[in-house]
Structure formats: C-alpha cells, structure tokens
From Swiss-Prot:
Protein's name in the database: Co-chaperonin GroES
InterPro entries: Chaperonin_GroES, Chaperonin_GroES_sf, Chaprnonin_Cpn10_CS, GroES-like_sf
UniProt keyword terms in alphabetical order: Chaperone, Cytoplasm
HAMAP family (UniProt xref): CH10
Predominant cellular place of this UniProt entry's protein: cytoplasm
Source organism (scientific name): Lachnoclostridium phytofermentans (strain ATCC 700394 / DSM 18823 / ISDg)
GO MF annotations in UniProt: ATP binding; metal ion binding; protein folding chaperone; protein-folding chaperone binding; unfolded protein binding
Family: Belongs to the GroES chaperonin family.
Length: 95
C-alpha cells in the first residue's frame, strides 16, 4: 500500500532524531524532541485550496523543515509518516 495525498497535502518520512547531545549525553526516548526535518515521499496535485490556486513547491526526495506541531501522524505497513499541508513546510534543505 502507499499513501496518495490530496490537494495541497504532502507525505513526509521523519528523519531519525539524534540520540545523543553535542556534549555526549545519551537521551532516553521520552526526552528526545520530535524531529522537524523530514524527507518528502509523496506530493498532492495542488489545485484549488480554499478558493486559491496552489502550486506545489516541493517534490519527492526533497529534505524539508516543517512546523513542530503540524500534520497528522499515520502508520502504514509498520512505517510511520506525517501528512502536512504544504503551508506547514517552512523550508527546503539545500545540499
């Protein structure tokens, strides 16, 4: 199965969060912050959203930064994804 987003929605796969701090302290599961960096795995078609034409600016494979509390978490075939509106993506990480 695969997720196919509608409208201006984007499916993200969260990148793994750091398990140790810069000073070498190992963080237990509850102490780790929710990562805000993810890879785009699917992009909706855009189109009319709330009466405005939306052009999708991200593409599959882009690494992005998204708003901390944005989106809906989804588990599919033992994999976890987050579905966000394109508007909740604040930046594309350029190499």
């Amino acid at each position: 199965m695969k997720l196919v987003p509608l409208g201006d929605k984007v499916v993200l796969k969260q990148l793994v969060a750091e398990e140790t701090t810069k000073s070498g302290i190992v963080l237990p599961g509850q102490a780790k912050e929710k990562p805000q960096q993810a890879e785009v795995v699917a992009v909706g078609p855009g189109g009319m959203v709330d009466g405005k034409e939306v052009t999708m600016q991200v593409k599959v494979g882009d690494k992005v930064i998204y708003s901390k509390y944005a989106g809906t978490e989804v588990k599919l075939d033992e994999e976890e994804f987050i579905v966000v509106k394109q508007n909740d993506i604040v930046a594309i990480v350029a190499d």
